């Protein structure tokens, strides 16, 4: 991979998904080398030409799925979840006590462990309310592969 090809890929990924890979040349090369061979692209330039010309977005989706890192597990960053349960939720409960309406967006959800953890914490926190609160949790990720896995709930 030439320096120009690397910069082109890094800039494209950052513009489409906000993923900063400028210091991760070995990751980009490692993940794309086999992908290009398997899919019979003659070069990174050939591949990126096709990605950028693809109006369906399928090739962009494939590129993002290939380059995204899906590191996740239940109660990951326990301190964050403790803060959410012990500080954030009580503040929300007080501020929204009339509406009893809670909407949470969990970005970078990966295979679902973080949003499922949030759902369990929310259910536990509001359990004494007898279902009076309308809670919704939206889980998103740029990797469609991991979202499909998360939606299965396995």
Predicted regions and their residues:
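Conserved AdoMet
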Residues: 2-105
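Class I S-adenosyl-L-methionine-dependent methyltransferase module
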Residues: 97-154
């Amino acid at each position: 991979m030439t320096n120009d090809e690397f910069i082109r890929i890094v800039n494209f990924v950052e513009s489409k998904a906000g993923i900063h890979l400028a210091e991760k040349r070995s990751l980009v090369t490692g993940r794309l080398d086999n992908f290009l061979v398997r899919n019979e692209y003659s070069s990174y330039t050939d591949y990126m030409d096709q990605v950028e010309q693809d109006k369906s977005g399928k090739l962009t989706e494939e590129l993002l799925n290939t380059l995204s890192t899906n590191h996740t597990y239940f109660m990951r960053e326990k301190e964050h979840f403790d803060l959410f349960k012990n500080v954030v939720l009580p503040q929300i409960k007080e501020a929204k006590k009339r509406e009893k309406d809670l909407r949470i967006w969990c970005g970078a959800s990966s295979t679902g462990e973080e949003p499922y953890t949030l759902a369990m914490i929310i259910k536990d926190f509001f359990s004494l309310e007898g279902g009076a609160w309308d809670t919704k949790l939206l889980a998103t990720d740029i990797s469609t592969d991991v979202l499909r896995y998360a939606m299965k709930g396995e």
